[in-house]
């Protein structure tokens, strides 16, 4: 079962494939970054920036027509940063209900209008 809450859901399209016809790993990573940004923005109650991606693991390929669902879970909230565990699962015709395809740890920092780090108030981090 997916770990965390559903952050985004999108359909893998032909334009997102690599030369072998599978979905390009960079596209999947960008979907995870978008999903993590959604969750981190909610936690920070404002603008955030990705500062690190660790342990990116591609378990299975993603195919055209798969519905890609990205789930996020809070691992740690610091003074200005948030560490999130993100997992991508697909819904695929004629397959088990969900298949985990990718996971990684993303770190985001809360930033102000000038792009400088700003505090994340831990007492308001209930998402």
Regions found by a protein language model. Give the residues of each.
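HotDog/MaoC-like acyl-thioester-processing domains
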Residues: 2-8, 63-64, 75-127
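Hot-dog-fold acyl-thioester-processing enzymes
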Residues: 1-52, 109-127
């Amino acid at each position: 079962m997916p770990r965390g809450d559903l952050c985004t859901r999108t359909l893998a399209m032909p334009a997102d494939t690599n030369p072998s016809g599978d979905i390009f790993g960079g596209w999947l990573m960008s979907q995870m970054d978008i999903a993590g940004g959604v969750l981190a923005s909610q936690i920070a109650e404002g603008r955030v920036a990705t500062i690190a991606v660790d342990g990116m693991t591609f378990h299975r390929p993603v195919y055209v027509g798969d519905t890609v669902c990205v789930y996020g879970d809070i691992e740690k909230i610091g003074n200005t940063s948030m560490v999130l565990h993100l997992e991508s699962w697909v819904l695929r015709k004629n397959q088990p209900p969900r298949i985990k395809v990718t996971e990684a740890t993303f770190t985001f920092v809360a930033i102000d209008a000038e792009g400088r780090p700003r505090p994340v108030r831990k007492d308001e981090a209930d998402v």
